[in-house]
Curated annotation (Swiss-Prot):
This is UPF0473 protein LEUM_0559. It comes from Leuconostoc mesenteroides subsp. mesenteroides (strain ATCC 8293 / DSM 20343 / BCRC 11652 / CCM 1803 / JCM 6124 / NCDO 523 / NBRC 100496 / NCIMB 8023 / NCTC 12954 / NRRL B-1118 / 37Y). Pfam families: DUF1292. It comes from the Bacteria. Belongs to the UPF0473 family.
Length: 99
């Protein structure tokens, strides 16, 4: 998983209505099982105790390991979703990710 950096990477997503929303990268990880990289995003400016929908995508990292909105791919396989949710739950259970 990527390290928590002082500088948070942000990505703009466009919904079906054409509205733009700014998201912060929560973390990224690579799955050897699927040989893919994943990125998890949260809306910008959320409070620590606020409940949010976390967005997850497959992405192809650039030379710096970063992602852009043009490179995000929907996850469509149920087993793949289960794996991503498992990684997310492990991340959320580790309090050190939020210090």
């Amino acid at each position: 998983m990527s390290e928590n950096n002082a500088e948070v990477q942000k990505i703009t997503l466009i919904d079906e209505s054409g509205d733009e929303a700014l998201y912060e990268v929560l973390f990224t990880f690579h799955s050897d099982e699927y040989n893919k990289d994943y990125i998890l995003l949260v809306p910008e400016g959320i409070e620590d105790d606020e409940e949010v929908d976390i967005q997850a995508y497959i992405f192809n990292p650039d030379e710096n390991g970063d992602a852009t909105e043009e490179e995000l791919i929907q996850i469509e396989d149920d087993k793949e979703w289960d794996m991503v949710e498992e990684v997310l739950n492990t991340f959320l259970e580790d309090d050190s990710n939020f210090n």
